[in-house]
Structure formats: structure tokens, C-alpha cells
Amino acid sequence: MRKAEISRKTAETDISVTVDLDGTGRYDIRTGVGFFDHMMDQLARHALIDITLRCEGDLHIDDHHTVEDCGIALGQALTRALGDKRGIRRYGSFHLAMDDALVRAALDLSGRPFLVWNLPFPTEKIGSFDTELVREFFQAFATHGGITLHVDLIHGVNSHHIAEAAFKAVARSLREAVEPDPRRADAIPSTKGML
């Protein structure tokens, strides 16, 4: 069973997250940050990973701790659900078009966290949401999920479309990478023998 549950409590946030890598993309996200919830819905739906996420954060300060800490907890849950990563495809990539926006994502569930980020936003905010928090989320998610992640904007003029295309592109890449590979049923996808 490729499922995991993580609880994470700090002075800034109180988070619980469950993931099912063999789900259908069901989601129940409540962080108190509307735009971020919308993006997390997209991540779950397009990765076909069931995600339940609850966060009580210090939103009276700003959204930063909530968004970053959700990335940490989700990355930890992914790591736990993958176990030793036996039988997975490991790699995934996807080009995602959404109206004016075209985003490319590529990732490796290598256990070596690294983020390459080339996703400039034309505005500093999407409604009240700081666009810089998109990178903060993916940095935390990649670090705590042990993911090498590249996200590149190929074209885009609308910040909402760019952000949504990024979440969907990463989701589709993740969907490919966590999927069981029938040709490697019980094999670790590395010549090292471990990830």
C-alpha cells in the first residue's frame, strides 16, 4: 500500500496530510489560503494522487509559513509513501499548455533534492497571493521529497495561468514518476541498488 500520513506541528503551523499514490486524484484541501488550495487541488487531480491536507497557520502574519510548511509535509508524505521506491518509473516530464502559458517540468525521484527554477511571473501577486510563494512551495516539496525538479516557463503573460500550468506540469510529471513500471516490478530503478 503506497499511502502515508504525516502530522507536523510547529509554532507557525499545524499540518496533517495523507496521500495515496494509487488514488484517482481525489482531494480535500483546507489551508486557509484560497489560491494555494486551488493549486493543491490541481496537483492532486492531475497527479492522480489522493491528497487530504489540513493546515492551521499564522495567516495573521502572511501566507509564507503555511505554503512552505505544506510543501515540507507533502514532501515527507511522498517519501514515506514511496518507501524504497522499488518498481517505480522514477523519472517524469511534461509540457503543460494553459491558454497563454506553456510550462515544462521534469523530475527525478532520486533522493537527491535539487530545484532548478526558471518561472518568472509578470506580477508580484495573484489576487492577494504572493507569486514568490509558488517557488517556496516547490523548493520545500523537492527538498523534503528528495526530488530533483526542473520547472521552466517557455511562454506566458498571465500569472494565474503560469502558476496553474506549473502545478499541473509537476503533477503530470509526478504521476509518471511514481507509477509502477511493470517491466521492473520489484527492481530499484538505479544501478546503485538504492535510491
UniProtKB/Swiss-Prot annotation:
Disulfides per UniProt: none
Associated pathway: Amino-acid biosynthesis; L-histidine biosynthesis; L-histidine from 5-phospho-alpha-D-ribose 1-diphosphate: step 6/9
GO cellular component, one term: cytoplasm
Alphabetically ordered keywords of this record: Amino-acid biosynthesis, Cytoplasm, Histidine biosynthesis, Lyase
PROSITE patterns according to UniProt: IGP_DEHYDRATASE_1 (PS00954), IGP_DEHYDRATASE_2 (PS00955)
Family: Belongs to the imidazoleglycerol-phosphate dehydratase family.
Protein name listed in UniProt: Imidazoleglycerol-phosphate dehydratase
Organism taxonomic ancestry: Bacteria, Pseudomonadati, Pseudomonadota, Alphaproteobacteria, Rhodobacterales
Gene field: hisB
